[in-house]
Amino acid sequence: MARTDRDRWDLATSVGATATMVAAQRALSSDANLIDDPYAAPLVRAVGIDVYVRLVDGEIQPGTSEFDPHRMAKGMACRTRFYDDFFLDAARAGVGQAVILASGLDARAYRLPWPAGTVVYEVDMPDVIEFKTLTLADLGAQPTAQRRTVAIDLRDDWAAALREERFDTQAPAAWSAEGLLVYLPEQAQDALFDNITALSAPGSRLAFDFVPDTAVFADPRWRAHHDRMSELGFEVDFNDLVYHGERSHIVDHLSGRGCSLVPLFRVG
């Protein structure tokens, strides 16, 4: 089903299911030297999407496609490590606020060794925030930083909601928009970065990833992956979840607002 302007979801439906997919890929990572996320698999099981539960429980064998979930997990492990290092490098440099936009099943507030006094803000849909908070509490997990949740749709006035949770606009912050941008319409994407710029004190940092051309989700190789996941019982079509069409180039958008940008890598 195609997106609508005011659509909503939980972690088992629509865009929310992509957060569960990402958590499953983190759980599949076998290299403990790269990432360590002990909460990924329990969170996936708690959501209960059958195909991802079977994946993390080892009931689905690796395939040969480049989009096979097991192969994609290797890329997700690298992405996760990049953002882990981004936040910890910022924190060690004295940046005491971290803001995780569209936090999903991200457990960095619980699993990273944050310096004392660090405040981690998680911004996501109310149902997503509530589910993760309650599930991690049931697991006995304790945050390793001061965790503050902002339960709001990123298409709404999340900046005001963030300030209400005592975000300090006079202190630098580290921001992440991980795996997020393709799920926002053009206006919301531009507003997202304008808000980040307006809220950021000197010394703030921002990390994000983006897909230059969403036509990749209609590529025959990706469609083969979709068909394979459908065979396994997962019916969400990612081509229906992303916003297609022209939008501002993020690098140009931020450069025009005085940001210093460092491209780290490009895939494809």
Curated annotation (Swiss-Prot):
GO biological process: methylation
Key words of the record: Methyltransferase, S-adenosyl-L-methionine, Transferase
Gene3D superfamilies for the chain: Vaccinia Virus protein VP39
Record-listed E.C. numbers: 2.1.1.-
Gene Ontology MF terms: methyltransferase activity
Cross-referenced InterPro entries: Ppm1/Ppm2/Tcmp, SAM-dependent_MTases_sf, SAM_mthyl_Trfase_ML2640-like
Residue numbers binding S-adenosyl-L-methionine: D124, D153, L154
Recorded superkingdom: Bacteria
Pfam families per record: LCM
Family the UniProt entry places it in: Belongs to the UPF0677 family.
Free-text function comment from the UniProt entry: Exhibits S-adenosyl-L-methionine-dependent methyltransferase activity.
PANTHER family, per database record: S-ADENOSYL-L-METHIONINE-DEPENDENT METHYLTRANSFERASE YKTD-RELATED (PTHR43619), S-ADENOSYL-L-METHIONINE-DEPENDENT METHYLTRANSFERASES SUPERFAMILY PROTEIN (PTHR43619:SF2)
Name of the featured protein: Putative S-adenosyl-L-methionine-dependent methyltransferase MAP_0663
